[in-house]
Amino acid sequence: MPRARWLQSAALMGALAVVLITAAPVAADAYQVPAPPSPTASCDVISPVAIPCVALGKFADAVAAECRRVGVPDARCVLPLAHRVTQAARDAYLQSWVHRTARFQDALQDPVPLRETQWLGTHNSFNSLSDSFTVSHADSNQQLSLAQQLDIDVRALELDLHYLPRLEGHGAPGVTVCHGLGPKNANLGCTVEPLLATVLPQIANWLNAPGHTEEVILLYLEDQLKNASAYESVVATLDQVLRRADGTSLIYRPNPARRATNGCVPLPLDVSREEIRASGARAVLVGSCAPGWSAAVFDWSGVELESGSNSGYRPYPACDATYGRGVYAWRLVRYYEDSTLATALANPTRPPANPQALTPPKVPAMTDCGVNLFGFDQLLPEDGRIQASLWSWAPDEPRAGAGACALQGADGRWVAASCGDPHPAACRDAAGRWTVTPAPVVFAGAALACTAIGADFTLPRTGNQNARLHAVAGPAGGAWVHYLLPP
C-alpha cells in the first residue's frame, strides 16, 4: 500500500478506536505537579489488563512518528492514543522556569562527588521511532531522538550494543544499537537497527554545539557484545567520534593505575563533574567489566544498583526498604521503568496503570531519598516528571524584586527573599549533619551564627541534602541558604 494511503488508513483506525472509548478522568497529583493523562487513558479505563492498550498505543505512536517523518507538520500528527510530540512543546520548555531550574540544579551539583550526584536519564534512550522504523523501534521506550532528549536536560543516556551480521557489510558483523535479547538468544529482536558509528555522532554533535560545550554526560553502554572483535570496534568508534573539531577527545578515560583484578577500572565515585570538566572531558562511559573496552569504559557493576522497588517507594525518609541509608551513601542507585509491549506481554495480568512506572508523584520521593540516576521511558518536556525532579526553586522563582537572598521555605522549596529579613540559617557541621541557628538572623549574620554552633553556613547541593535540611528547617518555618542571586 502506498505510504500516504497507509498513513490515512492508520489514522482513521486510531480515530475510530478513540470514538468508541469514553475519555478517562485525570487523577489529582499529590505533589501538585501538572501532568497530562496517559496517551492511552481512554483505553485504560475499560481494559482490565495492560496488553491491549499498550499495543494500541504502540501502533498509534508508530503512525504518528511516520507522519512526522514524511514532513507533515507535527501538530497534525498528534493522534488518539499516541504520545504528543511537537517542536512547540520543546521550544516552550526551553523558555520555562523548569528548564532554568534544572540547569541551576546541575550547576549546584558540579562540585559534588558522583556518589551523591543526581542525573536525569532515560532508559533505552536510543529505542525511538524518531529516526527510523524497525521491529524493535516499533516497541519504543522513547519518542524523542538522543539530541532532543539532551535538549530537555537529560544528561544520562543508555545505548544497548549488539554484534550482528550486517546487510551493508555483506554479512560481516557490526556493532549495532538495538533493543533485543543477547547473543545466547541469537540477538532476537534486532533486525536493521543502526550501527553505533551512526548513532554516536548525534551525541558528539550535541556536545560540540554552541551552548553545550561545557556539559558533562553519563553514557551507559549495555554490553550484549561478548566478542573480542566487537569490543575493539566499540573503542575505535568511541575514539573516532567522541572528539572536538580540533581533534581533542571528549572521553573521561579510566586511570590504569586504578585497574582492579578483573582487568577493569571501577567508576570512581569520589570524582565530581567539576573535576571531569577540568580534565577536558565531557563524556563518562560506563558499563559492565570487559577488558576489551576497559581503556575507555568504566566498570560500574560493583558500584551501581538497580534492583529496588518502584511500586513500593515511599516519601522521605521511608524511601525504599530494599536499601538502607548506607547504600545511598556509597553506591550509585538507579531506578528505571519499561513501557514496552514486550514487558507487558511478560506480565499478562498487569493492570493498565503500571505499578513500576516512574510517575510524577514518585519522582520527588526518589529525589529526596538520594536516587542518583533515573531511567525514564517516553520522557517528554510537558509530562511532569522533569518538574517533579526539581527540589530547589519553587515555581517561577526567583521572582524579580523579591530580594537577593535565597530562603528555603517551610515547604522545602526555595524562594527569593529580602536579605534584611530575620530567619534561621541553614548550617552543616563537619560530619554532614544539618541544623538551623537557634535564633533568626539577617542573611549577613548567618555565617557567624552558624560558626557559633560549630557549623558552616552553606546550601544544599542535592535533593537529598535539601530534604535533610528541610527535616530540621521546616518546623522552624524555613531557613536561609547560602546563595545570593547574581546582580
From Swiss-Prot:
Q: How does it sit in the membrane?
A: Multi-pass membrane protein
InterPro entries assigned to the protein according to its UniProt record, in alphabetical order: CTDL_fold, PLC-like_Pdiesterase_TIM-brl, Telomere_Capping_Maintenance
Which positions are tagged coiled coil?
none
- Chief subcellular location equals membrane
One molecular function GO term is: phosphoric diester hydrolase activity
Q: Name one GO cellular component term.
A: plasma membrane
List the protein's name. Answer: Uncharacterized protein MT2135
Subcellular localization: Cell membrane
So which domain of life are we looking at?
Answer: Bacteria
What biological-process terms (Gene Ontology) are attached?
A: lipid metabolic process
- Disulfide bond among keywords: no
**PANTHER family under this entry?**
MAINTENANCE OF TELOMERE CAPPING PROTEIN 6 (PTHR35518:SF2), MAINTENANCE OF TELOMOERE CAPPING (PTHR35518)
Q: Which residues cross the membrane?
A: 10-30, 45-65, 439-459
Task: Provide the alphabetized UniProt keywords.
Answer: Cell membrane, Membrane, Transmembrane, Transmembrane helix
